[in-house]
Amino acid sequence: MKYWNLKRTNQSTFEKVGPIPRSITNTFEKFRKELDPNGESEAIEEFRLSRHQTITSVKYIFLLLISPVLVNQASKFFDFGPCIDYLWNQEQPKIFINSSQEERAFAELQRFEEKIHFEVLLNPSGNISYEIIEKRVQLKARELGEYYANESANAVKNILSDILSIAVFILLMITGQRQISIVKSFLNEIIYGLSDTAKAFLIILFTDMFVGFHSPHGWEVIIEVILRHLGLPESRDFIFLFISTFPVILDTIFKYWIFRYLNQVSPSAVATYHNMNE
């Protein structure tokens, strides 16, 4: 494999922010390269370097995304899954592991009983005895018990598999410092290559999605899914506390980033953002 001069690649994207906006310095740098007699050979070298950077970045991003998912699914179905199922069914299986599961199961069973009662009221002349109703309720309760017992076992599998996936992701990050620097350079070149309007659009999209007026509803759904995935109780107090503080923290970090960094790197993008946001 050919070793490229990566120092030159990362220099433009990781240099400290100076008093002159980067767009102006890039314009002078482009003008200097056009007057350079060795500009053609440098352009070919930069193209090869850019292609190597793109291929390496795409491969490493794909590896970071796919490897933890594959490890998660493989460990869940082939390693932790059989062990958890065996231990879970050794004795009387525990149906519920938190109060939220009980509440959902009881509510679903109550709706089923009310549905049967409603059917009886609609058809009073039908041959539906109390024994038949009781049997249907018992079958439904048994079905709910099996469903939530499997959900409880799957929550334990999810916790173990997620821990292993996080460990694999951290290991890839630690052992891939060189690739990470290339990916950072690649992403920075993509971001700074966008027009000011595109940058402002992405900023508004991100802020409205995660810290905007309707974001609490999305955060509520996300937290409920995560808690249910891990088998944790879906505490409404915790969810409301999270969605009332975390978006505020994100909004503060975002505004500081605009003031401290983006305002010096691309002031025209900040001006476009303020004009579009008004």
From Swiss-Prot:
Reactions accelerated catalytically: K(+)(in) + H(+)(out) = K(+)(out) + H(+)(in)
Keywords: Antiport, Chloroplast, Hydrogen ion transport, Ion transport, Membrane, Plastid, Plastid inner membrane, Potassium, Potassium transport, Transmembrane, Transmembrane helix, Transport
Membrane topology, record value: Multi-pass membrane protein
Matching Pfam families: CemA (PF03040)
GO molecular function, one term: antiporter activity
GO BP terms: potassium ion transport
Bilayer-crossing regions: 61-81, 155-175, 203-223, 238-258
Localization: Plastid, Chloroplast inner membrane
GO cellular component assignments: chloroplast inner membrane
Family: Belongs to the CemA family.
UniProt function note: Contributes to K(+)/H(+) antiport activity by supporting proton efflux to control proton extrusion and homeostasis in chloroplasts in a light-dependent manner to modulate photosynthesis. Prevents excessive induction of non-photochemical quenching (NPQ) under continuous-light conditions. Indirectly promotes efficient inorganic carbon uptake into chloroplasts.
Protein name, entry field: Potassium/proton antiporter CemA
